Amino acid sequence: MAKFIFVTGGVVSGLGKGITSASLGMLMKARGFKTTNIKIDPYLNYDAGTMNPYQHGEVFVLDDGGEVDLDLGNYERFLDTSLTFDHNITTGKIYSAVIEKERRGDYLGATVQVIPHITNEIKERIREIARDYDVVVVEIGGTVGDIESMPFLEAARQMQLEEGRDNVAFVHVTYVPKLRVVGEQKTKPTQHSVKELRSLGIQPDAIVARSEDPLEESARRKISLFTNVPPEAVISAYDVEDTYEVPLMLEKEGLARYITKRLGLPEREPELDAWREMVERYKSLTDTVEIAIVGKYVKLSDSYLSIKEALKHSGVANGVKVKIRWVEAEDVEKHGVKLLEGVDGIIVPGGFGARGTEGKMMAIRYARENDIPFLGICFGFQLTVVEFARNVLGLKGAHSTEIDPQTPYPVVDLMPEQRGLDKLGGTMRLGAYPVKIKPNTLARELYGRELIYERHRHRWEVNPEFIERFEKAGLVFSGVAGDDERRMEILELPEKRYFIATQFHPEFKSRPMNPAPVFRGLVKAAKEKKFGD
């Protein structure tokens, strides 16, 4: 029988519930329990696929094609696992399912209500996933008191009643500010947040107190007294340099040990040696390389969270810290490529729409002509093709039909199966697809095998009618779709130091102990450029 750990948040959003949940899941897995994480997003969207990155950060793509909240990326990285679309529960999904059942007549004429029909649907989905696991960590998005979260908190309360207190625990993540005027940590916001939670019938078993500095003992005792939580279950979670330190901090504070005991699970020492070594290696790095990310959402770096993490993983693997230079693509259009001077590598990531397109291609040309290590991803792959068509093949006005439907040279075109679709949500080429890599190429050297599976999120592709012209001019398409060899997946320029682009998103499968090969190669090339071979 599975044990459930619900993680809730209070006071303010953006405290790091996702990292706390990922860390707790990782610590339970490190103890030998078969563990998974679920994210509940209380918005009415069915999934994250059509959301603006400036509002919610990147859209993370799963193997099964699910477009989900970026927290699931943290879960996958921390637990070194692959999740499914079912691991992301949204209000949109729940209400859609309940309305569909009502239309089908499943409720036999009953008045359909939030309680019990919505809450039952929520519990059913959580239990369905739990069947294969010992421990399930469920993060409830939003902040206690939000009207959107109410049905999910009620479902969690009911689950403790139905499963038994020994099988359900609650961890509440809250904020302890330190006012400069008085110079002490204030616990009142936490007290009120827990009071709100208790008014909903939920008594937290542990409190993770987020603060800038370690929690003062007086604050710990005060929180314990006013929230009815033992002092040892009031966990200090202060700011650290890197998120990968958080599991080690929470382990030192005893969170997983306390929850293990609270749920009646056997006490075990966690296997954390490899993780600890990875964190220590990262903290000890002194040499630095600078990689420019030229994008259209750079004002919110979480729009490219998985790319940031993949660079971090690759930095540790190559013995260098990676400093990111965030470059707004439109600024390149206004001020020129001088914004890229001095960088050791350039990434042009995915994105949609015309804004910043010319700036991205200016960055691609700058990398190509100055032999700067380069990686293009998804739309960056397509724009690399457009830039090459214009400036090497001399095809004036070449473009993607996404940006210019009337282009005389549609070197990037809508995939045939995408034509005629009238819905945006969930209709792209999504999820893991096979990619066949040609021998004697950089891609084969990086991946070390012929067949790989990588995650995709696109509607446009390289127009097969132009492939021969590109190849004659020296552009190598080193990877093709395993299910359709006319669909290009990887390109490279062999005469360059490191110049590669992928139609897929390699960042989504990068892990702290196993960096994505094309990122690892990019950082290696950047290091060699700066420090010599």
From Swiss-Prot:
Keywords: ATP-binding, Glutamine amidotransferase, Ligase, Magnesium, Metal-binding, Nucleotide-binding, Pyrimidine biosynthesis
A GO BP annotation: pyrimidine nucleobase biosynthetic process
Pfam families listed in its UniProt record: CTP_synth_N, GATase
Stretch list, region Amidoligase domain: 1-265
Misc. comment: CTPSs have evolved a hybrid strategy for distinguishing between UTP and CTP. The overlapping regions of the product feedback inhibitory and substrate sites recognize a common feature in both compounds, the triphosphate moiety. To differentiate isosteric substrate and product pyrimidine rings, an additional pocket far from the expected kinase/ligase catalytic site, specifically recognizes the cytosine and ribose portions of the product inhibitor.
Residue numbers annotated as active site: 378 (nucleophile), 505, 507
InterPro entries xrefs: Class_I_gatase-like (IPR029062), CTP_synthase (IPR004468), CTP_synthase_N (IPR017456), GATASE (IPR017926), GATase1_CTP_Synthase (IPR033828), P-loop_NTPase (IPR027417)
Function: Catalyzes the ATP-dependent amination of UTP to CTP with either L-glutamine or ammonia as the source of nitrogen. Regulates intracellular CTP levels through interactions with the four ribonucleotide triphosphates.
Binding site for UTP: 13, 186-191, 222
Activity modulation comment: Allosterically activated by GTP, when glutamine is the substrate; GTP has no effect on the reaction when ammonia is the substrate. The allosteric effector GTP functions by stabilizing the protein conformation that binds the tetrahedral intermediate(s) formed during glutamine hydrolysis. Inhibited by the product CTP, via allosteric rather than competitive inhibition.
UniProt-annotated binding residues for L-glutamine: 54, 351, 379-382, 402, 459
Assembly with partners or alone: Homotetramer.
EC code(s) of this entry: 6.3.4.2
Listed name of the protein: CTP synthase
First-tier enzyme category under EC: ligase
